[in-house]
C-alpha cells in the first residue's frame, strides 16, 4: 500500500513567499517579518497590501491602496436588499456566503481572471467584506444598516457600522491588531480550498465562496465561539480547575487549545493575551480573562510536554466580546481578516497555475460483475 498523507499533513504542493510557520518553535512570519512586529508596528491595510503584492509597500502605494479601500466600502443597493430579506436566525456564515455570491452577480468584472482583474476584485472584496458582515448583523437584529465612513480606519469603520457608534482609538486599534493576527496563516483548509477552486481557472468570487464554505466548518472556524461557550459554562475562576481537570481526565477536547501546526505557543495567542488582559482590566470585564489565565496554567502544566498549548482562538473571543461583538459573528470576522490572505494566495498561485488533481488509494472490490437487481441478496 502507498503512503497516504491523511489530511495532506506535511504534503508540499506549491511554493509561497507570503507566510512561513515553524510550529515547533512557535514562529509565524509574513514576508519574513515576525507576526509580533506586524501587530505592533503595522495595520491591517498595510499587511493586506503587502500580501497582495508580496512586498512591503511604499508610503505612496499604501496611501493609494487605503484610498481605494475607502472608495469601495459601499455595497450595491441590490445586495443591501438581499441582506435585509434574508430569513431571521440564519447562520451568519450562510448569510456571508450568499451575499458574496450575489455580489459576484453584480460585478461586471467577475468573470475576468486576468492578473489585473483578480487584483482589482481583491481590493474591492477586502473593502466590502466588512460592510457586508456589519449589514448582516444589523439586518438580523432588525436595525437600520449603517453606511460606511471614509474618515475611519478599516477596523474602526467596521466597529462603527456594526454598533452605530464610533469606537475609541484604542478599540479601533485593538480590533486592527486582531485583524492583522488573522490575515493569513499558510495553507490552512480555507486557503487551500480557495486555491483549489482557482486552479480550475474559476473566478475570484467562486474562490472566496469556496473558502467561506470551508471556514464555516467547526474544525476550522468557530473555535473562539466555542471558547466563549466554555467560559460561560465555567462561570467563575474558582470553578475552572475542576472543569478543565474533569475534561482532561475524560479525554475531552478543550476548545482553543492545541493546533494542527503549532507544538508550542501559537505566537498570535501571546500577542492577544497581553491585549486581552489590558482591555479586560480597563473595561472591568476581567472575569473571562481570569478564567482563561487559570485554564492556560493547567493546560501548560499537564499538556505542554505533549506540545499542546493555547492557540489564537483561546483569547480572541474575549477580545471580540469586550468590543461588543456577539459570538455568532466571531467566524465571519475571521473571514473579514482572512479575505486578504485568501486573495493573496489565489493571486500568487495563479502566477504559475496548475490544476490540482490529487489521487486516492483504491480499497474497494475488484473483479466483480454486475448482478441483476432481482438476484441480489
Curated annotation (Swiss-Prot):
The active site is at residues 220, 259, 313. Keywords: Allosteric enzyme, Transferase, Tricarboxylic acid cycle. Pathway: Carbohydrate metabolism; tricarboxylic acid cycle; isocitrate from oxaloacetate: step 1/2. One of its GO terms (biological process) is carbohydrate metabolic process. CDD domains: citrate_synt_like_1. Pfam families: Citrate_synt. Its EC number is 2.3.3.16. InterPro entries: 2-MeCitrate/Citrate_synth_II (IPR011278), Citrate_synth-like_lrg_a-sub (IPR016142), Citrate_synth-like_sm_a-sub (IPR016143), Citrate_synthase (IPR002020), Citrate_synthase_AS (IPR019810), Citrate_synthase_bac-typ (IPR024176), Citrate_synthase_sf (IPR036969). It catalyses: oxaloacetate + acetyl-CoA + H2O = citrate + CoA + H(+). It comes from the Bacteria. Belongs to the citrate synthase family. Homodimer. Citrate synthase is found in nearly all cells capable of oxidative metabolism. This is Citrate synthase.
